[in-house]
Every structure is written in C-alpha cells, then in structure tokens.
A protein has these predicted regions:
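Generic secondary-structure signature for well-ordered alpha-helical cores
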Residues: 11-14, 38, 66-69, 73, ...
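Residues at beta-strand starts and edge strands
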Residues: 29-31, 62, 131
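Metal-dependent enolase-superfamily TIM-barrel catalytic cores that perform enediolate-based chemistry
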Residues: 129-130, 134-220
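Metal- or metallocofactor-binding catalytic centers and their adjacent structured scaffolds
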Residues: 36-114
C-alpha cells in the first residue's frame, strides 16, 4: 500500500503515418494510457492493439476508469486479479487483455518514478546488460517477393544485423512462401540473421515441408 491514488485516466490514439513506405510502424496505430495521481506522478503505458479494434480497446479503458480513480497504483497484483476475475463479469477477451497491458505498464511506470528507480529493480533486478535488436519485417500489403526483399535490404542498410519476416499468408502455396524467403535471403546476404515467424498461418504439414526446404538458407 502507498499514499498514491489515481486521479484520472486518459487515452491517446496515434494514427499511422501512411507515408507509403510499408514499414510495420508506418501502418500501425498506437494507443497510449496516461494515469495521473494525487502526488503529481504520471504513469504512461502502451496497449497492444489490433488493426480496426483500437477504439474497442480504448473503450475498455474508459469503462475501467470509474474503478481506477482513487485506486492505489502500487496494488498491481490486486488489479490483475480483479480485472481478470471480476471486470466484465469475469469473461475477458483479447481486447480487454490489450487494455490491461497498457494500464499495468502505466502503474509500473508510476511506481518506478515514486521510488526513483528503474522498473526492472522493482521486478527483481536486471538480467541483461544489453539486448539484441532486430528488424521486424512486415509483409502486409506487399504484392511480390521482390518488394519484401527490397524492404529487408533497406533495413540492413539502416544497420540491423538481424531480420524477422512473416512469409506465410492464408491460401498460399509452398512455392510462393519459399520464393519469398529465398528473395529475402538473397537481398540481405548470409551475414545477416534471418528469422521466420509462421504466425498461425500454416497448416502443420505445410510448416514441416517449408522448414525442410528453407533449412539450407540458414534460418535462425
């Protein structure tokens, strides 16, 4: 328990830039949560959002506001138990999980500022001195393997030494998926690490077949 109390809950939707570059971040909407407190300490959190459902997630946050005002933000575990078991009659779905994520992050942000320490210290201390950064290559909206490969090449030129791609799409043949991976590997060379995310779009037998075919391409 602490002397802190939440006094207001605000949301901010940041639309995508749509600058035509087709990068993941340029086509993604962001949803931020701001928790204000009686001690002048504000906490910020970012919600995971799904395309076309940003307003639904924001609405969940607004519905939770009446429960969050006057709530002690240090009681993060209590908040988790309550929201999963009691809010919305204890029947949470993906949109609610997205809303919860931003609120919880904002609570941790408040407590880090309150105790004047990085949040990782509140979670048990640091584990790594540094983390590997990789480029997340979106294939949404691309019409050809060459377009995907060109975007990957641009990311390597920016300094990334590892790229993750999503080569599968619903209804595509194994040959189409394989060609997309081959083109990206050719574009980024053998020194750059290449990762594959199936993202629930492949049937088990298709995933096994593709895995065998791309094995020589040095997939991380």
């Amino acid at each position: 328990m602490s002397e802190l109390k939440i006094t207001d809950v605000k949301t901010y939707i940041v639309p995508p830039s749509f600058d035509g570059k087709k990068r993941w971040c340029d086509n993604k909407t962001f949803l931020f949560v701001k928790l204000e407190t009686n001690k002048g300490i504000d906490g910020w959190g970012e919600c995971y959002v799904l395309r076309d459902r940003e307003r639904c997630i924001e609405l969940y946050i607004k519905e939770m506001k009446r429960y969050l005002v006057d709530f002690d933000p240090s009681r993060i575990k209590f908040f988790q138990d309550w929201v999963y078991n009691s809010f919305a009659e204890g029947r949470p779905g993906i949109d609610l999980f997205c809303a919860i994520s931003g609120i919880e992050i904002a609570m941790w942000d408040i407590m880090g500022k309150y105790y004047n320490t990085p949040v990782y210290n509140l979670l048990g201390g640091p584990v790594h001195d540094k983390l590997r950064l990789y480029a997340n290559l979106s294939t949404h909206g691309y019409k050809s393997p060459e377009e995907v490969a060109e975007q990957a090449k641009e990311m390597v030129a920016m300094g990334f030494t590892a790229v993750k791609m999503y080569p599968f799409d619903f209804g595509e043949s194994d040959d189409e998926v394989y060609e997309r991976v081959v083109k990206v590997r050719e574009a980024i060379g053998n020194e750059t690490e290449l990762m594959i995310d199936i993202w629930r779009k492949a049937q088990p037998d298709q995933a096994v077949n593709i895995a065998k075919r791309i094995e020589p391409l040095r997939i991380t």
